[in-house]
Swiss-Prot record:
Keyword match Cytoplasm: yes
PROSITE patterns in the record: GIY_YIG, UVR, UVRC
Disulfide bridge positions per record: none
InterPro entries, per the entry: GIY-YIG_endonuc (IPR000305), GIY-YIG_endonuc_sf (IPR035901), GIY-YIG_UvrC_Cho (IPR047296), Hlx-hairpin-Hlx_DNA-bd_motif (IPR003583), RuvA_2-like (IPR010994), UVR_dom (IPR001943), UVR_dom_sf (IPR036876), UvrABC_protein_C (IPR050066)
Major localization listed first in the record, in broad terms: cytoplasm
Pfam families xref list: GIY-YIG, HHH_5, UVR, UvrC_RNaseH, UvrC_RNaseH_dom
Keywords (A to Z) from UniProt: Cytoplasm, DNA damage, DNA excision, DNA repair, Excision nuclease, SOS response
GO BP annotation list: nucleotide-excision repair; SOS response
A GO molecular-function annotation: excinuclease ABC activity
Protein purpose: The UvrABC repair system catalyzes the recognition and processing of DNA lesions. UvrC both incises the 5' and 3' sides of the lesion. The N-terminal half is responsible for the 3' incision and the C-terminal half is responsible for the 5' incision.
Name of this protein: UvrABC system protein C
């Protein structure tokens, strides 16, 4: 048995300088990372005999070792603390769950550039606008730009293989650059207007469009004037929706709200006086449950944890914390930019602040209510399946394909708080007979649980398989083969009517068949997970199928680049006509030699 931590001996040698401390348990697992102006004073507060909050007392009870790192000042300590939290994600720290990269609007290079959504490393050549608080905010901006200026948003592979305009051209949301229906000069002007909007210069853009409209009207070019009039009206409507009264500059309005059981931080992004969007964050609450502690932890992780994240000039917050000065100094050190944090604001800015507080409160209350509802369903499922404990992790699998084409298996994961989307997985199924769902499911389970056997990932408490007796038997064989024979399996088969509420369930083997009443909370949970697995499989299948159908077999031919491929398709009128052509006919196309024609013909008829 390990010796209890000797706090007195540790504190006797502890420095009183600024720094970072790390607390470990008996198995050397990092429990908590903190910073302090005075390490000795801060650490002594953990080991007093009375007055500790329950979570803090639980943390102290697990401490077996404490390590400290002395820093030159509090700002340096804050930066080191955030680095360690991001790397190790200690269980007793406040943690942002949503740490994925934020989306940008991407404008590609080229004569006819495209607009699209981009996440991750900025490797592609072009311009990036953002980041936006959510993909929904970007889609809203892209939809507006498509209606107003008709800059293409299709993938380059799709664009390069067009021989006639697509539906977007027919509904006047694209000008058909793929088939030469717009000049490079006219398209460049539409791109320039789109860039002005994305840069927040909407007022200047509106004035410019007004001047162009008057000029077109004076020249009796009424069709062009009407087009500009519609663009101006659309722009004004968006300005009315997005501009905050009295707003200007770049501001993030951040409000934190804490209730027993959780916390929510609501962020409203305002750029150039225009609202780009808003987003809710639900951080994992550690030992600090005060709203000011949640706010300080959020600001540190959000603005210091990602060097690429766009930094506003000002933050408006609903609470104050002693760390705010250190945070602004750390931003200056790390980002080379000044940041002000305001709390006491008036007028319009006070209304922004209150709006963020209201949104945070409502979002947290809704989340807690949903969590209680979900927890009740998990308890009902435990009773139905006669489990000793309420399950904490459910996995469900489904298969999707179109007559065997582009087969995809999905894995969705649920816990008592709802879907765990970061744990979702898709599997592109290869090497099985087209349309063989059993073989596809077998491959997906082998891949998933083979990794779990190797130490990657977590084993669920219950495995749901959509498909009935055959799929359940196959899943049981895979689990026994991999050494997970004790795992609870639940097969879900549609009833005779194939309507929701009439599902037939199989527990562990086909002999244990049963049904549940339509109003059963356990059945509702099963249906929810099954439907989510189905949705996730279908979206993955459609994406894979669409990519395969957009990819031309010409793309694999050496010497046939995008321009030559496009010219070749235009010459023959499409891929179908090119497929019918002989080698001699292909060689007659402009720029195609006999040798290249043979390569093209071989590629088109390789199957």
């Amino acid at each position: 048995m390990s010796q209890p931590f000797d706090a007195s001996a540790f504190l006797a040698t502890c420095s009183g300088r600024p720094g970072v401390y790390r607390m470990f348990d008996a198995e050397a697992r990092l429990l908590y990372v903190g910073k302090a102006k005075n390490l000795k004073k801060r650490l002594a507060s953990y080991f007093r005999k009375t007055g500790l909050a329950p979570k803090t007392a639980a943390l102290v009870g697990r401490i077996a070792q404490v390590e400290t790192t002395i820093t030159a000042n509090e700002t340096e300590a804050l930066l080191l603390e955030q680095t360690l939290i991001k790397e190790w994600r200690p269980p007793y720290n406040i943690l942002l769950r949503d740490d994925k990269s934020y989306p940008y609007v991407f404008l590609s290079d080229g004569e006819f550039p495209r607009l699209g959504i981009h996440r991750g490393a900025k490797k592609a050549k072009g311009r990036y606008f953002g980041p936006y608080p959510s993909a929904g905010a970007i889609r809203e901006s892209l939809s507006l730009l498509q209606k107003a200026f008709s800059v293409r948003q299709c993938e380059d592979s799709y664009y390069a293989n067009r021989t006639r305009p697509c539906l977007q051209y027919q509904i006047k949301r694209c000008k058909g650059p793929c088939v030469g229906l717009v000049t490079p000069e006219e398209y460049a002007e539409d791109v320039r207007h789109s860039v002005m909007f994305l840069e927040g210069r909407s007022q200047q853009l509106g004035n410019e469009l007004n001047a162009e409209m008057e000029k077109a009207a004076m020249a009796l070019n009424f069709e062009k004037a009407a087009e500009l009039r519609d663009q101006i009206a659309l722009l004004r409507r968006v300005q009315d929706q997005q501009y905050m009264e009295g707003g200007s500059g770049d501001v993030d309005v951040v409000a934190a709200f804490v209730n027993p059981g959780g916390a929510c931080v609501h962020l409203i992004s305002v750029r150039g006086g225009r609202v780009l969007g808003s987003k809710n964050f639900f951080p994992q609450v550690g030992i600090e449950e005060e709203v000011a502690e949640v706010m300080a932890a959020f600001l540190s992780q959000y603005y210091l944890g990602n060097a690429e994240r766009e930094l506003p000039g000002e933050l408006i917050v609903n609470v104050v914390h002693e760390d705010f000065d250190a945070i602004t100094e750390a931003v200056q050190t790390l980002r080379g930019r000044e940041l002000s944090i305001s709390h006491r604001v008036r007028g319009t800015r006070a209304r922004w602040q209150q709006l963020a507080v209201t949104n945070a409160e409502q979002a947290l209350n809704a989340r807690l209510a949903n969590r209680q509802h979900m927890a009740a369903r998990f308890e009902a499922l435990a009773q139905v399946l006669d489990l000793d404990e309420v399950p904490q992790r459910l996995e469900c699998y489904d298969i999707s394909h179109s007559s065997g084409e582009a087969t995809v298996a999905s894995c969705v994961v649920f816990g008592p708080e709802g879907p765990l989307k970061s744990d979702y997985r898709r599997f592109n199924i290869e090497g099985v007979t087209a349309g063989d769902d059993y073989a596809a499911m077998h491959q997906a389970l082998q891949r998933r649980y083979g990794r779990i056997k190797d130490g990657e990932g977590k084993l669920p408490d219950v495995l749901l398989v959509d498909g009935g007796k055959g799929q359940l038997n196959m899943a049981r064989d895979v689990m026994q083969e991999l050494g997970f024979g004790d795992l609870t399996l639940l097969g879900v088969a549609k009833g005779v009517t194939r309507k929701a509420g009439f599902e037939t369930l199989y527990l562990n083997d086909v002999a244990h068949e049963f049904t549940l009443k339509g109003d059963s909370p356990a059945l509702h949970l099963i249906q929810q997970i099954r439907d989510e697995a189905h949705r996730f499989a279908i979206t993955g299948h459609r994406a894979r199928r669409g990519k395969a159908r957009r990819t031309s077999s010409l793309e694999d031919v050496a010497g046939v680049g995008p321009k030559r491929r496009r010219d070749l398709l235009k010459h023959f009128g499409g891929l179908q006509e090119l497929n019918r052509a002989s080698i001699d006919e292909i060689a007659k196309a402009p720029g195609i030699s006999k040798k290249l024609a043979e390569s093209i013909y071989a590629s088109l008829h390789s199957e």
